[in-house]
């Protein structure tokens, strides 16, 4: 915000009186009362010589750059600084007008493609590139209005043809940003030492490195995961988990993948492959058009990042505010296995829990097509399995009356299968689907077998009762039915032992989550797997979580009945119960930057001693250092398993550092780790904390040390750049800078930037900056008289940063300017065609309030 206090102190009483009168004129003009006012310039000091007050007399305002709220059809849609220029209406009255770009109108939901003349006039004859950035002519839209309310600092738009916002998350394709060309690298490194002192001293060292390089060129994304590990007595080993190239096909809402990936699991079980895949990309589609996805609920103690993994792969990362949260837009990917949820609190703590997951009923909106085409080789995690060629085609289509038809074909050497199903949306009663799959396959050493499987699935959310999600499924498989992995995994190198595959006949699952309002959430889930060659396997789970007055509590119970041996040689039932509580102590010991909490935890499992743990954690150094001290006790344990542990984490501008020391009577452990990310781009190389697949490059040139988004340690580097990760693709992401962390000589007129990245993009989130001194400049003409009151002064010759600072001259020829270099040029304009130029140089010492005071002559 501009500090003009010094300028006002030097303005005479007459100047203040004039300002009041001008404000009154503006108010009356905004009220729609057309009157003509006349000011006596002689009332100003110096007799008002050379002063042109015509603009004020006509109820106009000075052109310039103003911060405005943009109001569209009564709703605020944006806030930013905009440049306004003076124009006159049909009756000759002055008014201020700004430039509405194609990108802005698309962001606000205007159907710009329906009005070809909206940008044609302003871009005509100036080249295509200029036309893209041309200003909109709203007269091309019938009944559209535009009005700048100067007193309220609002740009009010009335546009009848705004796209409806019924499809939540449907951001126009015109806003999707493929980002900039870049090289990315996420990295982690850990080293540990364990010293065992039970029966003879033994020391074990371990080292682990993870590298995730990537390249972005236009819409193409190349990604790889490479790891290296070494432990005592073993040599280091490099391993590449996957490498693939992919791109979005925006026009058909699809994605093309070349390399190593997994097929979707909506019809057939997911299959790892190496080859090519083209499929629908649901992240490009509004939430209400997508296939059903599970809901993950929980409670965050602080602003937290929620990570959801399936089969070890990160499928969702989202930032939530403190309190209860619900993730409703999870992609249905992977193998249909359970979801592992991690709540990463901003204080460094983490909650981890599991959400049982069953592929839900298939019910698509009318007219929506979802498909997948895959060709390549089978890619087993077992190196002994042969790389058999395979292909898969699946399709789902939404029909009228709430029906969905779907099916697919799957084939490989020694295996073929076909599936057909029908889904039905029952409206308020939920959705149900029924399908069957016929398979024919030959396992190694066996004859061909054929079989069928039938599956019925149901899911529903009951909003009135607060039941957030219910899912039930039942699957029956006949003898001789096999999935593709069941068959291909048997074709192995003869040097390796044959691996038995599960011969499951039935599978039943149930999951329920119930909201209790202010009392929290309760969840129930269970499953039963029945086999032909072994006893059944059962799982039951229950959980409860709540938060009251920042005190968090969670209780979990689970029961597993596992059978051993392929013919039921043994079975075991294992119960596990845990309770966790966190109580903040900030009101007594902490503060805004060093929240202190105490935690207590109890864990008990069948056949194991009960474990109790008490801890104390907090933050220091502007929340960048997280510390955690814990003591674990096992009463009655003969192994003396009581353990003390200290964890430290430093969240830095260029990455994170971690350290852990653990001590007990029989063992000592020491671990240290580093992690971070790097993006090489056309403007240099930027380092930061670890990021996800989609990254925002924060660019605020010259503003170093600015905090981004409130996350600990995420600050701009010495050049004003940093990385903000885990952006949501095809959705609007708002990135903010904290103005209280700016350097003294830096200003950022607009502290938030909005981007809509495509999946895997590195998007540039640029901020206009003014870096330099703040000064009160006294401007005089060659004859020594001050510049006329109302003259507009701007800084010339600024490139690469924000538009130069601008100010209005007072009645003594003084103007307040910011973002000034040590020396430069000024331009002053007044009246119709009057202007002059001046050179300035800032003095060595600052005046009051850190503002330079200087004089110069305008010629």
Swiss-Prot record:
One of its GO terms (molecular function) is fimbrial usher porin activity. GO terms for biological process: pilus assembly. It is a multi-pass membrane protein. It holds the Pfam family Usher. The keyword Transmembrane applies. Transmembrane segments: none annotated. The keyword Signal applies. One of its GO terms (cellular component) is cell outer membrane. It is found in: Cell outer membrane. Residues 1-28 form the signal peptide. Its main location: membrane. Keywords: Cell outer membrane, Membrane, Plasmid, Signal, Transmembrane, Transmembrane beta strand, Transport. PROSITE patterns: FIMBRIAL_USHER. Involved in the export and assembly of AFA-III afimbrial adhesin subunits across the outer membrane. Belongs to the fimbrial export usher family. PANTHER family: F1 CAPSULE-ANCHORING PROTEIN, OUTER MEMBRANE USHER PROTEIN. This is Outer membrane usher protein AfaC. It comes from Escherichia coli. The lineage of its organism: Bacteria, Pseudomonadati, Pseudomonadota, Gammaproteobacteria, Enterobacterales. The gene is afaC.
